[in-house]
């Protein structure tokens, strides 16, 4: 793509999840601007498509985006998010959109929604589920925050999301930190299930003295039933 062409969306953070999500957007035909403070991350990023631009300057990154600007944060939760938001606010205009795709605490997201609104910036907290593979090929997306922002980014998010029976695994939950709240509940359920699987294995292996093949057969049977 040419330097004059404006990008549809920008991604900040090119770690495992950020790079995978960016490639997902690129593969779906969205012109994507990429920014990372890490020179190593910028050099490591590769895509078979040419509809993206990588920046080491946050100002140039923002200038490359079409209006209203759509900025997707894929960075570590907590203070780094607040630091990046602080660096973005002077560069953005009213109606521009910031989306946080990390695992931020939902109450922090609600505060950020309110603070950004004071500057006329639309803020969203977005739960992303599916890990590296999901981010690349289609994650489950739990969106919360500004309903106005949702209407402007919905087409992009639904396009990159996983699909089940023809429908995008992507939805708007509610305002504030609702998206990150649902992701938190999702994670709690997931980790509880993983713990149950581990304890079940331990019971079969060390109490029932079952061999690896027997245990595998049990789990395979469960995979074919309602426990799948």
Regions found by a protein language model. Give the residues of each.
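N-terminal small/polar loop signature for handling phosphorylated ligands or for N-terminal nucleophile
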Residues: 63, 87-88
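Rossmann-fold dinucleotide-binding core
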Residues: 81-84, 99, 105-216, 225-227
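Short, conserved loop/helix-junction motifs that constitute active-site signature segments
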Residues: 90-94
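Beta-strand segments within the central parallel beta-sheet cores of soluble alpha/beta enzyme folds
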Residues: 13, 214-221
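The beta1-alpha1 cofactor-binding region of Rossmann-like NAD(H)/NADP(H)-dependent oxidoreductases
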Residues: 39, 58, 78, 106-108
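Glycine/threonine-rich flexible loop motifs
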Residues: 70-87
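NAD(P)+-binding Rossmann beta1-loop-alpha1 motif at the extreme N-terminus of oxidoreductases
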Residues: 1-69, 95, 132-135
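Structural motif
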Residues: 12, 35, 55-57, 74, ...
């Amino acid at each position: 793509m040419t330097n004059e062409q404006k990008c549809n969306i920008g991604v900040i953070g090119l770690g495992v999840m950020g790079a995978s999500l960016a490639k997902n957007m690129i593969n779906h035909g969205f012109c994507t601007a990429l920014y990372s403070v890490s020179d190593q991350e910028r050099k490591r990023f590769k895509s078979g498509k040419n509809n993206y631009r990588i920046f080491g300057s946050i100002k140039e990154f923002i200038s490359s985006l079409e209006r209203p600007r759509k900025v997707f944060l894929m960075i570590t939760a907590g203070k780094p998010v607040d630091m990046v938001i602080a660096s973005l606010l002077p560069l953005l205009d009213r109606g521009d959109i910031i989306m946080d795709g990390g695992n931020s605490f939902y109450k922090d997201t609600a505060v950020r929604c309110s603070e950004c609104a004071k500057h006329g910036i639309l803020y969203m907290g977005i739960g992303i589920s599916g890990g590296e593979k999901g981010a690349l090929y289609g994650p489950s997306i739990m969106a919360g925050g500004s309903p106005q922002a949702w209407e402007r980014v919905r087409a992009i998010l639904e396009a990159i999301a996983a699909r089940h029976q023809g429908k995008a695994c992507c939805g708007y939950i509610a305002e504030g930190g609702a998206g990150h709240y649902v992701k938190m509940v999702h994670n709690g359920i997931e980790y509880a299930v993983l713990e149950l699987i581990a304890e079940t294995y331990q019971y079969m292996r060390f109490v029932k003295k079952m061999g690896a093949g027997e245990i595998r057969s049990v789990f395979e049977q469960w995979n074919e039933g309602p426990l799948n």
